[in-house]
Amino acid sequence: MASIDLTVETEIAASPADIAAVMFDPQREPEWMPAVKTVEVIDPALQPGARVKRTASFMGTDFSWTTEVEAVHFPHVLTLRIADGPFTGVISYNIQRSAGGSVVRVRNAGETTKLGFVPASMIEPPMRAAIDASLGRLKNIVEGERVKG
């Protein structure tokens, strides 16, 4: 198994609450995460223990995974444990106010389970690029909604 630990961040010209309203809503993930194809909310409340199943495509492979909320401190922190899928570990969303709005960080830390034969050095660059692209889409959505609202 390959160990992965990467963090990607961007600045978004919006409040943490405006960002979290999109970022912490699993139903909106396909809007800002191109890899995510479907979302099935198993437990609708945003609270520890709540589960969501997703399907996605990454590096030419279709797969699904289930996350469980470990911690939520709206609108600043959402920590998800990956309960099953091709990757086990934790995804953390962190939103902190900044001079220009908010700094948004996504951290993925864990191990591959289904891609164990592929070294981390081959997984991390496309994963980092995918997260960076997702944060760019999130930025466009949130800043666009802010202008409309």
Residue ranges and their predicted role:
Residues 2-3, 16-17, 140-149:
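Generic C-terminal helix-cap and adjacent flexible tail
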Residues 12-14, 58-60, 110-114:
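Beta-strand elements of well-folded, non-transmembrane domains
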Residues 8-10, 41, 65-71, 82, ...:
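Hydrophobic/aromatic beta-strand elements that line small-molecule binding cavities or substrate pockets
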Residues 3-11, 51-53, 64, 77, ...:
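Intrinsic-disorder/low-complexity, polar/charged segments enriched in Ser/Thr/Lys/Arg/Asp/Glu/Gln
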Residues 13-17, 44-47, 70-75, 94-103:
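A short, structured loop/turn motif at beta-sheet edges
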Residues 52-57, 78-84:
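Short beta-strand segments that buttress and anchor functional surface loops
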Residues 1-47:
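Hydrophobic ligand-binding cavity/cleft-lining segments
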Residues 79-133, 138-140, 149:
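Beta-strand/loop substructures that line and gate deep hydrophobic ligand-binding cavities in soluble
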